[in-house]
Swiss-Prot record:
The cytochrome bc1 complex contains 11 subunits: 3 respiratory subunits (MT-CYB, CYC1 and UQCRFS1), 2 core proteins (UQCRC1 and UQCRC2) and 6 low-molecular weight proteins (UQCRH/QCR6, UQCRB/QCR7, UQCRQ/QCR8, UQCR10/QCR9, UQCR11/QCR10 and a cleavage product of UQCRFS1). This cytochrome bc1 complex then forms a dimer. It comes from the Eukaryota. One of its GO terms (molecular function) is metal ion binding. CDD domains: cytochrome_b_C, Cytochrome_b_N. It is found in: Mitochondrion inner membrane. It comes from Sorex roboratus (Flat-skulled shrew). The chain crosses the membrane at residues 33-53, 77-98, 113-133, 178-198, 226-246, 288-308, 320-340, 347-367. Keywords: Electron transport, Heme, Iron, Membrane, Metal-binding, Mitochondrion, Mitochondrion inner membrane, Respiratory chain, Transmembrane, Transmembrane helix, Transport, Ubiquinone. The lineage of its organism: Eukaryota, Metazoa, Chordata, Craniata, Vertebrata. This is Cytochrome b. One of its GO terms (cellular component) is mitochondrial inner membrane. A ubiquinone binds at residue 201. Heme b b566 binds at residues 97, 196. It is a multi-pass membrane protein.
Amino acid sequence: MTNLRKTHPLMKIVNSSFIDLPAPSNISSWWNFGSLLGICLIIQILTGLFLAMHYTSDTMTAFSSVTHICRDVNYGWLIRYLHANGASMFFICLFLHVGRGLYYGSYMYLETWNIGVLLLFAVMATAFMGYVLPWGQMSFWGATVITNLLSAIPYIGSDLVEWIWGGFSVDKATLTRFFAFHFILPFIIAALAGVHLLFLHETGSNNPSGLSSDADKIPFHPYYTIKDILGVLLLILVLTSLVLFSPDLLGDPDNYTPANPLNTPPHIKPEWYFLFAYAILRSIPNKLGGVLALVLSILVLAVVPFLHTSKQRSMMFRPFSQCLFWVLVADLLTLTWIGGQPVEHPFIIIGQLASILYFLLILVIMPITSLLENNLLTW
């Protein structure tokens, strides 16, 4: 008798995706982050659902409702901090996942990569709107500053901003619509992640060597299911440690002050995972130029596959490209640090240099280095 998992219409989809899927035998722990992102998304949707049961999206009561969740709801504090720090874990996994793709040349699977870039934008939009919901000082001023950037768009800018606000400032209408979008977007992200997997399974996974692994495949279950479970346990260990020992480590103290349109905080800054993009935005004195640089800092990932000049897919056997990759990582860490600093000397010039280096590395230096490495192969 044929196994039910191979014949049942629903089970065979699961079977071909997670059980009998042929996977390369040599994929390292860097390939764990896809499943970790899936777990993060599930955690965020579940904790978010329970938070939404007690939250009110009204400017008068939003801040109080979050306080009520933390004080009066059974384990409300736990749900709230799991959700807030779950977002940080989500972005850590995202950045490592994208970094893995850049290092090992996974971007050569164009459809998978482009949907990944789209997913990155969707997750960033969701996180931004979620940060506005507690209606603290940084929520309000962060929303005001970032939405105001759209006014830099020629001709339609100011109308567009008022349309998004639903009035002449960030107010009740803005909060209500942000809550609605913040609730629906994770489900769109889940659907996109399904398409991401669909395209990935058309080609099969890449592997550290960047070479074809058709000659050496192993079944996903039990080898990679057990490996993924280890990754999930480590993720949960880090997340629970963060939530139970220092839940406010990655947050901003200003967000414990209720939103006040008449009082601007001394340093307006987003959550840590947006600081690199915020630093690039601030590095350009022109408003429109800054907005373009902000968008391009992520959109540049979509161009990477077309700038692949190497004869080899992965960086595993390319020492010069490896060095440049780690310079890029250091540059992004520098930008993250600068994004959290006040706009004064020497931080301004450091931010500008780091921003220029970021784009130069991806668009110019790395492709040229790959060409030089090609010549070294024939030398």
